[in-house]
Amino acid sequence: MKQNSFIYLRGLKHAAFTVFCVENCQKFYYDPQFNVRVPFSSGQQVKRSVLEKLNDILGVQPSPTEFYFDVDKKGALKEGEVLSSCDPHYVDQLLGGWMRTPKGGKEKAVKRRSPLSISAMTPLHPLLSGLPKENISFDRSDRPNAHKVVVRDANGNVLTDEQVCNFLDGNDRSLYRKWIPDNNRATGLFVYDVAIDQRRLFCVSTNQFEPEITADMVESLKADGWTVVNTAFGECLSMPKEQREQLIPAIADALLDWQITSNQARTFSLMETLAVAVSDNANTLAAAIRAKLIDDNESKPKARPIIDENAGAKTFIALPCANYIVTETESADALVRARQELIDRMMAFDYENQL
């Protein structure tokens, strides 16, 4: 029987009073079954966080991106294309995929689908997350002499200090304090899913009718030791084994130990990984880390998180998981073992002889 080409991963994370995606302070969607708003992090943000972690682990720069803008006849700046380098020498390009479609149609479009299919990070169950609001203030009223206040009238003219004082008579306002109400925050138990297509993980197609890379890049990769292999997708170039073996441990680390930090200057959460399930059968992941509705004869439904070690997937339960889920098998080395499981599976795949 042919080896399974996919590795499926489900991770369970805890987030506390933080911000994922900024849209009205925190992106959310409405769950129609339980009539609640639930926060989420988009798959794009999860993917970017994983790739940023990967670059940090390897100590390499991200791939360069070209941003194009057009100035129209009226002198206004218009949005143009955003073009990737389409260079698999960059690990974030190789694993993240790319698309390059220059304006004008004179250059052939080049595109590669990522070998990592990554879900949005959503609540384990709609009833196991929250979207609380926080009212905050930007307050500098303790040292008013150190700061400057500028008040403008309806025409944009700056008022004098005397005019400002006259205006404030009868107005209970502080000019050194900004009130910022209704800031949504995310909290609760969240899951993300990853499917790793090992057939394309370290391979790029050489087909020039629907190209992933240019003909020049094909020659460049061959010169760097990439070898021609035949896969289910046709002729491809495979990364040298020694380079793969350097990347695989970093990929495993990044998939387990990423955090969202882009919006968290003052709402940082550890986003600790509580549990991990790994399998070559996607169905077993949903059973291994799940929630169950509880009927306790109360007006509001409740949900209980469950880690099931007998659902067909290999599960790894970290110590912090016991804060939120009743379990007897949590261990200090759970994530180390999960990392090794991912490494072993990726190392075992025969990238040169896929057919």
Give residue spans per PLM region:
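RNA-binding basic/glycine-rich loop and surface signature characteristic of RAMP-family CRISPR effectors
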Residues: 1-355
